[in-house]
From Swiss-Prot:
Region (Tail): 399-455
PTM info: One of the most prominent phosphoproteins in various cells of mesenchymal origin. Phosphorylation is enhanced during cell division, at which time vimentin filaments are significantly reorganized.
SUPFAM superfamilies tied to this protein: Intermediate filament protein, coiled coil region
Official protein name in the record: Vimentin
Source species of the chain: Cyprinus carpio
Feature type site, description Stutter: 342
High-level lineage: Eukaryota, Metazoa, Chordata, Craniata, Vertebrata
Coil 1B as annotated region, ranges: 145-236
Protein location: Cytoplasm; Cytoplasm, Cytoskeleton; Nucleus matrix
Amino acid sequence: MASRTNTSSYKRMFGGERPAMVRSTYSSRQYSSPVRTTSRVSYSSASSASPSIYMSKGARVRSSGPLPRLATETLDFGLADAINTEFKTNRTNEKAEMQHLNDRFASYIDKVRFLEQQNKILIAELEQMRGKGSSRVGDLYQDEMRELRRQVDQLTNEKATVEVDRDNLGEDIERLKEKLQEEMLQREDAENTLRGFRQDVDNASLARLHLETKVESLQEEIAFLKKLHDEELAELQIQIQEQHVQIDMEVAKPDLTAALKDVRQQYETLASRNLQESEEWYKSKFADLSEAAARNNEAIRLAKQEANDYRRQLQSLTCDLEALKGTNESLERQLREMEDNFSMEASGYQDTIARLEDDIRNMKDEMARHLREYQDLLNVKMALDIEIATYRKLLEGEESRITTPFPNLSSLTLRETMKETRPAMDSLSKKVVIKTIETRDGHIINESSQNDDLE
């Protein structure tokens, strides 16, 4: 006899081994000898620890106790905020796929019930066929079990496909979030540039006001200098006219006293001396006035030149101011357009965020419902597996009792069975599978599995 352990999705889903089957073959008949196996399945996570499930299979299974229930991890759906809007487009497809899986599982349950009826029929046939030789009940049972295992594997593959689609949707969500962050950064850069332009406009306005004030002060100073120069010229002209009149009067007086020649001569001498002094004073005064006029003319020329320079600077600044006004108007227009665009984009992003939040809430509810349904299905499947194991043990017990009417072969069968069963019993042990998952902010940061064999 050969001991074989089938490894399939059963192990991946429930973390345990399939019950070992030990076959004893004699001539053309096949008999299944039950081997007692014990398996323990335990799941644990970083956030919560769920109770373990202990299931013992032996030659007899008592059905009076409550059915074991598979423990599931306590899921924190608040960590699933990373799921994005792409789920909405695939939600209907996933729902249809889950409904299809539910229908297939319902058909699987119907088939199991049908197998129960077939088992009853086979038990009746076994009662009739006792003493008539071996039957192909074991082969039929194995064929049905292989078919059921194939269906379970197919369901597992479909489940893996759905999980891959879910991971792809998560990647799309991350890509959209990165794009949203880039758009927000571009908007901040544009706002910073706009603030810089506003500062430049303010500085240009202050410079223009300062230059206008300076031009006004220079114009007032030029007007004051002109007025002062005109007043000085008027005073000089008045002084020159008074001196001419005085000189004429002093020269004419000697002409009135024809009788007094001596006095005339004295006055003539005095007049000539006064005239000479007046001429010298006039020349010196005229030189001073000419020098002052030259200085004033130079000052006026410099003032005019400076005024012309200021006028040119004023014109240049006026042109710059007009250009800055045009630039300011253009920037303000661009600012209004950008604000309108950003407001529309922000409203669109807000709508997208609201839609994403609605989709996330819906997906959370949908995931919770699917998990509850999956838990119920796992519980039903566990109960069905226990019932199938019970019926299998009953069938094996019936087959083992068929061998009792053959006294000549009993010792040989017993020896072969014991010989093949002992190594299988020695190799079987209690296995504990501990799976630990640590999550943070909705992301799995650590996942580990530990297998412990209990002798």
